[in-house]
Amino acid sequence: MKHLLATSITIALLSLGLAGCGEKQATKEVTSDAFVTIQGQDLIKPDGTKLFIMGTNLGNWLNPEGYMFKFSKTNSGRFINEMFCQLVGPDFTADFWKAFKDNYVTREDIRFIKEQGANTIRLPFHYKLFTDEDYMGLTAAQDGFARVDSLVEWCRESDLYLILDMHDAPGGQTGDNIDDSYGYPWLFDSEVSQQLYCDIWRRIADRYKNEPVILGYELFNEPIAPYFENMEELNGKLEDVYKKGVAAIREVDSNHIILLGGAQWNGNFKPFKDSKFDDKIMYTCHRYGGEPTQAAIQTIINFRDSVNLPMYMGEIGHNTDEWQAAFCQTMRENNIGYTFWPYKKMDGSSFVGITPPENWANIVYFSEAPRATYKEIREARPAQAMSRKAMMDFIEACKLKNCVVQEGYIRSLGMK
């Protein structure tokens, strides 16, 4: 993480970093009728039929979260990387992250998702993948575009739509572990962070403006956690920051839909006052727990009806198969498409489960141990050979061929 004193210098250097991310266009120019469009509360495919989103999230692949590794205290990408570096050193950690990105999601995973009846995948990603900032073992040669290019190709082969979701925005948009931030949504108070957010989205949109596989761009995930005393003040800034991102994208891309999530875990849509500032926007909500009934989401339905635009449940899950089946029925009855969270993680509550490798419990123990001083790190650190083997065994365990297919979970989603 670079600390620069002057805003102008910061932006200049960040621009240089972005310039190194690649210039290749994903496809040749296509006409606007090749893309999914909006008609009232419906999404319409190029052939004129309705698209009802059903699918999953590729969570943890490009935005690691602690609980998917069975870590609790070590819960953000930054914390996980720091812990691994303390455990096995920075060079081995960098090698681990490359192997992780190469194997956690592959062409075979995308084919499997399609075979389960899905039509859409949501890709959560970290903004750092498109900068020169240290992230997942890389610095100046970040691989965000290479990873997305591969996923676009795999989705095209499997006839799946792709939503690009900036899960971790510059400065942090949530203020919690899920945005890998410093505990506050600084994005809304920082012009520098907002400029970087716009610059990254402009470059992403310029690269994929002619790619019909991409359904849309989700500007950021779950803005403004409910913990902050100035929550309402932050909520008042939300729509304006969204508008800045939309404007940046529209400089280069008029084809794609843009998705806007509500405040407070994508559940509060009161901050939105203007649904007409762009003719290709839709809204996205999230929900975990509660009753699987229409009454439980009536406020979301009411907002959707008031703006007469599509609403989509971008995240939902971590419940019983019976609950999920009932709620999927509720969403289908109310024309709210869905992508369940996540596709893959340790144990269950996902399409496929990763079996913890031998001695993984020792890594979990280290992740939870006090590590505030060098003495504490030394005292808590398990044997190097064992730790390194457990991490490499995790890479094998996360491959689709070695995962446990959660048949009941998949059936509960009603995608076939």
Locations of regions flagged by a protein language model:
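C-terminal motif of bacterial Sec signal peptides marking the signal peptidase cleavage site
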Residues: G17-G20
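Hydrophobic helical h-region of N-terminal Sec-dependent signal peptides
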Residues: I9-L14
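Extended, alpha-helix-rich binding/interface surfaces that flank or overlap catalytic cores
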Residues: T330, G337-T339, K344-K416
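Bacterial N-terminal signal peptides that target proteins for export
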Residues: M1-S8
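Active-site mouth of glycoside hydrolases
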Residues: T31, F35-I257, G262-P271
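Extracellular glycoside hydrolase catalytic/binding regions
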Residues: D33-V36, Q195-K345, S350-S367
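Bacterial lipoprotein signal-peptidase II cleavage site
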Residues: G22-T27
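Low-complexity, flexible helical/coil segments
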Residues: G77-F79, L87-F96, S158-Y161, I200, ...
